[in-house]
Amino acid sequence: MLKLVGGGGGQDWACSVAGTSLGGEEAAFEVARPGDQGKAGGGSPGWGCAGIPDSAPGAGVLQAGAVGPARGGQGAEEVGESAGGGEERRVRHPQAPALRLLNRKPQGGSGEIKTPENDLQRGRLSRGPRTAPPAPGMGDRSGQQERSVPHSPGAPVGTSAAAVNGLLHNGFHPPPVQPPHVCSRGPVGGSDAAPQRLPLLPELQPQPLLPQHDSPAKKCRLRRRMDSGRKNRPPFPWFGMDIGGTLVKLVYFEPKDITAEEEQEEVENLKSIRKYLTSNTAYGKTGIRDVHLELKNLTMCGRKGNLHFIRFPSCAMHRFIQMGSEKNFSSLHTTLCATGGGAFKFEEDFRMIADLQLHKLDELDCLIQGLLYVDSVGFNGKPECYYFENPTNPELCQKKPYCLDNPYPMLLVNMGSGVSILAVYSKDNYKRVTGTSLGGGTFLGLCCLLTGCETFEEALEMAAKGDSTNVDKLVKDIYGGDYERFGLQGSAVASSFGNMMSKEKRDSISKEDLARATLVTITNNIGSIARMCALNENIDRVVFVGNFLRINMVSMKLLAYAMDFWSKGQLKALFLEHEGYFGAVGALLELFKMTDDK
């Protein structure tokens, strides 16, 4: 019980706390405030240690007594009734920063006595370990009423364990003056019932568990993310995307070292995605998996598997996003790494329809990182890079492997819908030199207008059967032969589509001729710009990449011929097997990097 007793005109007060906390014994605490009187009703000029003669004023102590049934009497520091009335003492708070009061288990008790004053300073009341309730009448309300009794300065000092262990050697600063609190720590009504517990403050009340509404798939995703985080790898599936203006390029890593435990824990939609992507070579009407480009037995981020290369037209992007929503892809991943202009264009659609966030990456950064990685791992035991030997002689021209172990510096020509030309001096040091809007998109668009074809494959197939000299005006059409002064051969193109000014020529050409002339026009323009950039940058290796070169042997041989002929053998045109997928590979590598950074 916490009791406040005043005296001396309200200037003096004593606060006592009595209760049971230690093995059926009664623990009592008192705090006294200095005032004008030495006791409640008057006395010496100042407060001393409670019950200690000649003690210095202000050197107050906090004492704890333990009174049990077997105890024969009480020390001089104990004032009040010895049976049923509790214990009361007066103490002044000395100036000190902390309070720690321990009981040395007198009379069989155990645990730590914690003062309510210290607990109140921290905003709560705590209690030491409790055992059996005390016998009736020991500090409860059924016994004699508690009262404050003035302490005689001349009383003898007791030497009980309570007096020794109750001595506080440091003390503490008194808390701000607050209205008196009444705290009862004993049983009510003198019964054997357990003592009442103080109600906990709201912030200490046990909080009910929040209801869980997550689906099993989301719980599994969380568990897999936690497991993957410990291994510094992202959760499956692993994708990288390059969303271009004409084509979407997608790379997918299929793990081949799945353990029995992983397969058992694998959620159904993850199995469905893996099976769908790896068991088909066509997806819908336009999606294609380039099986011949698959990289096998590859180790990525500590896992062994195969890397698959998939493409589909950008116009089918909304169908792809819808499929991701139907397969509940967001339960496996919340973020996809994507590069290319479409990563910005379709960002909102991914978020609204499929509940997926796109991590947008720079396409030129991804291009370089992906190219260097694929070249470093090789193409299933073969070199990734190659060139054409004897490009000026169609009969002797053949494909040869090229070692790109030391690639710097190189001129990188990315031939997609448009063209970008980069001068690369190291892995992280490059610049965009120039570009042109006349690229693969131009070729396909003109072919669709001129020939009625609908796909890139159709346009290339028609071009392979056509003759561009029926459409273009050549040097020999102007000079009647070579222009020897400047080394121009009569077969060189003087004017692309120059013969189409003549109605007679227009009536005699075929759609295949138009497709071939369109391909030669675009290719010659790119080759001319690349050669000038290589000369300006003083670089002798020109690497051509991009989906404009996919299954496009005509353009590759034309570029090889142009580089070799116009540079008199000083420039070498280089090509790569995975022409247009390097941006998507770079996006996949960024997925691993994001996990490492975390």
From Swiss-Prot:
Catalytic activity line of the entry: (R)-pantothenate + ATP = (R)-4'-phosphopantothenate + ADP + H(+)
Biased composition, class Gly residues, residue ranges: 38-49
Record-level Gene Ontology MF annotations: acetyl-CoA binding; ATP binding; pantothenate kinase activity; protein homodimerization activity
Keyword Transferase part of the UniProt annotation: yes
Regulation affecting activity: Regulated by feedback inhibition by CoA and its thioesters.
Annotated pathway: Cofactor biosynthesis; coenzyme A biosynthesis; CoA from (R)-pantothenate: step 1/5
Enzyme class (EC, first level): transferase
Family statement drawn from the similarity comment of this UniProt entry: Belongs to the type II pantothenate kinase family.
Name assigned to this protein: Pantothenate kinase 1
Gene expressing this chain: PANK1
